[in-house]
Amino acid sequence: MRCPKCDHNGTRVLDSRPVQDHYSIRRRRECEKCGYRFTTFETVEQTPLIIVKKDGNREEFSREKVLRGIIRACEKRPVTLEQLEGVVTKVEQQLRALAQSEIPSEQVGELVMNELARVDEVAYVRFASVYRQFKDITVFFKELEDLMKQENSTN
């Protein structure tokens, strides 16, 4: 690692510790020549996740886009931003665990709904109503019934 101050190629690591996401390491370094101390981050290189939309178009997975949709579903609900970011992180981890370069958008939506149901049932129903494009009230009621059956079977 080159020193950013004197460009010397020799540095030593003073301290290493994982960053909160556990995919990065923070290192404190010191230049062997000038003694300048600086911080570096080592991060796992992630291959991009490509989402195949319903119309066949492809786009890179966007945490921000998923988070915006979840935030909309959780308006005026007692859910923290930290919880919502946790949902997005879990969804992204599940997508990466699939080890597929291309993933259908339907699969992303299902994963989001599964995680959201664990956080807030009302937000889940809101998200599902937009995602699944309920055409009438009977489909909406069926989704509620399924959710209630699922809840009763876990209790």
Curated annotation (Swiss-Prot):
Q: What is this protein called?
A: Transcriptional repressor NrdR
Q: What PANTHER family does the annotation carry?
A: TRANSCRIPTIONAL REPRESSOR NRDR
| Xref: InterPro entries | ATP-cone_dom (IPR005144), NrdR-like_N (IPR055173), RNR_NrdR-like (IPR003796)
Kindly state what the record says about how the cofactor is bound. Answer: Binds 1 zinc ion.
* Keyword annotations: ATP-binding, DNA-binding, Metal-binding, Nucleotide-binding, Repressor, Transcription, Transcription regulation, Zinc, Zinc-finger
unnamed zinc finger span: 3-34
Domain ATP-cone, by residue range, is 49-139
UniProt-recorded Gene Ontology molecular function terms? ATP binding; DNA binding; zinc ion binding
Name its GO BP terms in alphabetical order: negative regulation of DNA-templated transcription
